[in-house]
């Protein structure tokens, strides 16, 4: 990665920062050799998927090992996760035998790059500051052990090649084990998914399912009674969480399902009718299934809101409140509620009062900021020179995957077609592509069949794609928080990454925030950005939550917020964070409206 950063530095794209970008044909030197792929076929799809054409990536239905199953009833004191899962018999967890083929499908092999678990800088997380506030904060764990974790979960964690807990996992495991609610802010890429899956599954493996009410109708009218419900703002993130859940529920009695809009509801209904113990869902589709009477929340022990600030920013608050407050959800105090996100400004914390009880507030790392594992470069490039500058960047990069962000769906298609014509293996993901096309594009990118992914905001938030070594902001966003989330797609789980941004006079609204981000992360600030900042109007960075300042990760109860007072322990080592941002919308499957989001409709 250091070599790639040096190559970018030596590209002569900014020989003189004040003069801006110098096109290759004016530099007095030949164009760099480009990455060729003679096996690429641009007919009927290829790596780009043809925007509706054929593709060699099959659209397999989600599910995989352990999701076949029968309807999970409470028959004779036993519970089974289908033919391939474990069983809960007379108060005891009986794991299924190990299956070599299933383990390869779920966990890969050690040298498989698609199953990246940790990077060369993972030990650096030991030095990340942590602030845990609330009553009687449990001591954090320092390693994966039993107790407090269940033995079967430990085996699955070992299969996934996780060797040590991240800071958020060190705290979340004992917090959940002690029956407490949790609001957690953690640096992007720092293991938030494991932060809620590990403790929730561990406790579920120990305590088993709740008894289900007797069926009120025929088999096809039965409801699913999940023990855990995880809500996420987008179908891509929901699918990603589900894929992780399949790994860690391996051989257990817990059957995981995922539901989201944009895909036929029939397949999802059939999976749910076979039994569902852990449900991952987007708010719109979950509301739809509740209205259809296919799901009951009466047995929910664990409610998880992932990217909670984003869901509220996207206008999902009415849906979430309906799910939590108006349906048959287990009430506050009788369930455990966990809220996870990269940012939690004060207004979201105030809303959390309605969903959490006696919770512990956890801030890990420089939340809402950029990882120091990411080397950031800002280049001055006029719009007409961007394609040429991009080719130079790509020619300097030979290893890993590159994620390129643009602002519009039209530009995503145009740039992808341009890159394909230059013999790069590129694909695109944006809102006009169908769900199956998006899944095929992501599968191609994850596997390395396509080394370039051109994306609108779809891939900007929450997705964990291994081996992304370079993020290029071809078009800078208007909000600095979106910039942070975009570049957070690299440098994840302790790995190093490079982020390059094309900047010009049209990006004046992000000048101050970008300067602040670079300075905060000890990155080089180019002179043209300093000059632009001096001339930019106003004094506050453009952030949709800028009104709450830079310290929005703080527990508002410490600052005299509602319910403040009487809060004892605090393991504080740092404070200084930023707010979130929002865009997108959920599925059209529900009658619930969308009130938030940005002008970019790329989610759909």
UniProtKB/Swiss-Prot annotation:
Keywords: Acetylation, ATP-binding, Cytoplasm, Helicase, Hydrolase, Initiation factor, Isopeptide bond, Methylation, Nucleotide-binding, Phosphoprotein, Protein biosynthesis, RNA-binding, Ubl conjugation
Cell compartment(s), UniProt: Cytoplasm
Cross-link (Glycyl lysine isopeptide (Lys-Gly) (interchain with G-Cter in ubiquitin)): 158
Lineage, opening ranks: Eukaryota, Fungi, Dikarya, Ascomycota, Saccharomycotina
Protein's name in the database: ATP-dependent RNA helicase DED1
E.C. number: 3.6.4.13
Function as written in the Swiss-Prot or TrEMBL entry: ATP-binding RNA helicase involved in translation initiation. Remodels RNA in response to ADP and ATP concentrations by facilitating disruption, but also formation of RNA duplexes.
Region spans: Disordered: 1-55, 67-94, 533-604
InterPro entries: DEAD/DEAH_box_helicase_dom, Ded1/Dbp1_DEADc, Helicase_ATP-bd, Helicase_C-like, P-loop_NTPase, RNA-helicase_DEAD-box_CS, RNA_helicase_DEAD_Q_motif
